[in-house]
């Protein structure tokens, strides 16, 4: 599958409007936001009314727009829940959503908008740093017309990277950060501890079935 192929459906056409959901998955640093912005700009050039939504708590690079890790930006509407932009979305033909995994109503919103004839493009992490499903985002897969998963470059060995590895000891699922907190990694490097992770506080990257020799006396548990 060509990961850059966009289905040729024209939202808001004079005949019957045909909605669709496009999903762009991948680990951190795989170019998800870059691809989302490329697709939205493509529709803007064709004079479609577009709405780009960003997660309001992600203020790493820009507070008023979507930003890639290399600081390319695009104006966006910040929100913590997609219902907050419902009316604006109804007035748009194309809706782009960045960091879709953080929105609790992502599945319901996308399905509702697609059923009203909108093209909805979602960029999201498919998995957490523990390689578990991120919220309800994977429930979009059976509803979507187009699903792609981009790979990054492993930041530890430079091979293809499909996973996101947390560098710190935080246990919460939602910890927003860049290269200071996360690496994109391949399968082998996901299980390889970095020097600062050799202590006993971070065991998320240990493969199942491997016995732990360093057992802490106590450990704070976070709900995830």
Swiss-Prot record:
GO cellular component annotations of the record: cytoplasm
Top EC class of this enzyme: transferase
Keyword Transmembrane: no
Residue numbers bearing the Phosphoserine modification: 13
Swiss-Prot/TrEMBL catalytic activity: thymidine + ATP = dTMP + ADP + H(+)
EC number: 2.7.1.21
Residues binding Zn(2+), per UniProt: 154, 157, 186, 189
Keywords tagged on the record: ATP-binding, Cytoplasm, DNA synthesis, Kinase, Metal-binding, Nucleotide-binding, Phosphoprotein, Transferase, Ubl conjugation, Zinc
Gene3D superfamilies noted in UniProt: 3.30.60.20, P-loop containing nucleotide triphosphate hydrolases
Active site per UniProt: 99 (proton acceptor)
Family: Belongs to the thymidine kinase family.
Protein name from the UniProt record: Thymidine kinase, cytosolic
Native species: Gallus gallus (Chicken)
Gene: TK1
């Amino acid at each position: 599958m060509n990961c850059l192929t966009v289905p040729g459906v024209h939202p808001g056409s004079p005949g019957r409007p045909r909605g669709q959901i496009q999903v762009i998955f991948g680990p951190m640093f795989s170019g998800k936001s870059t691809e989302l912005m490329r697709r939205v700009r493509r529709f803007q050039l064709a004079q479609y009314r577009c709405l780009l939504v960003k997660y309001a708590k992600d203020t790493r690079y820009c507070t008023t727009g979507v930003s890639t890790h290399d600081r390319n930006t695009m104006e966006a509407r910040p929100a913590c829940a997609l219902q907050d932009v419902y009316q604006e979305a109804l007035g748009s033909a194309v809706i782009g959503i960045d960091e879709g995994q953080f929105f609790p109503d992502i599945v319901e919103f996308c399905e509702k908008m697609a059923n009203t004839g909108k093209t909805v493009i979602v960029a999201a992490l498919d998995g957490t740093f523990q390689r578990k499903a991120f919220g309800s985002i994977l429930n979009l897969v059976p509803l979507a017309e187009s699903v792609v998963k981009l790979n990054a470059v492993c930041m530890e060995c430079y091979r293809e990277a499909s996973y996101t590895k947390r560098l710190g000891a935080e246990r919460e699922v939602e910890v927003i950060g860049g290269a200071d907190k996360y690496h994109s990694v391949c399968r082998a490097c996901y299980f390889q501890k970095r020097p600062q992770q050799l202590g006993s506080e971070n065991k998320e990257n240990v493969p199942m079935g491997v016995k732990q020799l360093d057992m802490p006396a106590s450990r704070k548990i976070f709900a995830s």
